[in-house]
């Protein structure tokens, strides 16, 4: 090695060219995820331990409900982990988007303005049930959330009172990266109760997320956004009138990002990284109007609800749309469902591998074991 090369390294000057990389740097793997099912436990839900060097970022409660008149309700609350590493809490209250009084999609309902902020909320284990409660002296309508490995409840004073059972098992996925990444833990619950006094049925995600210190989903250290990986990200479930159920996660992205997890009413789970598809952004170029998706040797389609656009969230990089996933040609009649997810129009409408020298991933048939 020449002295001139040593000098460049010592002074910290980069020896890399300005051309776009064709393979990952050390510590990156081309944005390949790792996914599987898992068994939810009280111990794990109570713990504040880090996974893969990522502390808890927050617990996300969110879902889709429909009343007897077909009106749609999408509630959401982000509960920070309460650690010193937490990012500033910019989503501090209960939010509810609904089609009530609107024909063009879901708008923000004012009930959230009077909800209690997350400041000082508590997390306790009482018997075999975990409780999250708003601070008793905090101003606003209180909240109370409970969880066990089998059931949960979510109460927002003067707004919502729902409860239900886990669609088993849990699902989780990990996206490694040297500076940005995510570990996402998904618990889907089938729920019923009342929202704004209306009887409703639907599904929610009860999902802890882990990110590098200071990270916050969609904002900082989120590779799906800052690396422009994400094309499609949906958590979804459908129970049919014959009692069968499909549920899972469907993602699609650039480079090596993308996977599908699929479960059924027997608790059987399959997962694959061999996925592809295309998003139809229509003439508007922003709101997706349908998705074609290939996984497990089947063709799938996302059917947006005619009023499924969450316009109340404002203009986003990843506009949110609710609807329903199904296999192409599936004639089963849905009974209760949710598929609230997103597509990112600025990232493209179909996958692109921007790392052509990464190498070829070869699948393994684990059935041989």
Task: Label each region the model flagged.
Residues 3-369:
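Targeting-peptide/extracellular-domain and disordered-appendage signature
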């Amino acid at each position: 090695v020449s002295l001139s090369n040593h000098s460049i390294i010592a002074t910290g000057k980069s020896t890399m060219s300005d051309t776009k990389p064709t393979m990952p740097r050390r510590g990156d793997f081309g944005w390949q995820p790792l996914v599987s099912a898992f068994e939810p436990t009280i111990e794990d839900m109570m713990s504040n331990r880090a996974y893969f060097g990522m502390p808890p970022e927050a617990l996300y409660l969110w879902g889709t409900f429909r009343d007897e008149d077909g009106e749609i309700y999408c509630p959401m609350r982000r509960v920070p982990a309460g650690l010193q590493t937490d990012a500033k809490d910019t989503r501090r209250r209960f939010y509810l988007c609904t089609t009530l009084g609107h024909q063009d999609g879901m708008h923000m309902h004012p009930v959230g303005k009077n909800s209690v902020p997350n400041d000082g909320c508590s997390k306790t284990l009482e018997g075999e049930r975990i409780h999250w409660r708003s601070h008793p002296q905090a101003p606003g309508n209180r909240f109370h959330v409970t969880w066990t490995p089998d059931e949960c409840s979510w109460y927002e004073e003067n707004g919502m009172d729902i409860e239900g059972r886990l669609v088993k098992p849990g699902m989780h996925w990990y996206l490694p990266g040297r500076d940005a990444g995510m570990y996402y833990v998904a618990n889907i619950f089938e729920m019923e109760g009342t929202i704004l006094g209306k009887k409703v049925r639907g599904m929610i995600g009860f999902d802890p997320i882990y990110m590098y210190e200071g990270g916050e989903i969609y904002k900082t250290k989120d590779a799906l956004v800052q690396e422009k990986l994400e094309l499609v990200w949906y958590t979804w479930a459908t129970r049919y009138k014959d009692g069968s159920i499909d549920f899972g996660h469907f993602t699609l992205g650039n480079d090596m990002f993308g996977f599908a997890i699929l479960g059924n009413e027997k608790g059987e789970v399959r997962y694959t990284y061999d996925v592809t598809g295309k998003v139809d952004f229509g003439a508007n170029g922003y709101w997706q109007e349908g998705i074609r998706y290939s996984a497990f040797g089947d063709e799938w389609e996302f059917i947006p609800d005619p009023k499924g656009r969450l316009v109340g969230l404002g203009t986003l990089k990843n506009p949110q749309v609710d609807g329903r996933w199904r296999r192409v040609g599936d004639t089963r009649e849905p009974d209760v469902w949710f598929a609230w997810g997103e597509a990112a129009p600025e990232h493209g409408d179909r996958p692109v591998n921007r790392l052509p020298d990464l190498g070829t991933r070869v699948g393994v048939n684990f059935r041989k074991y």
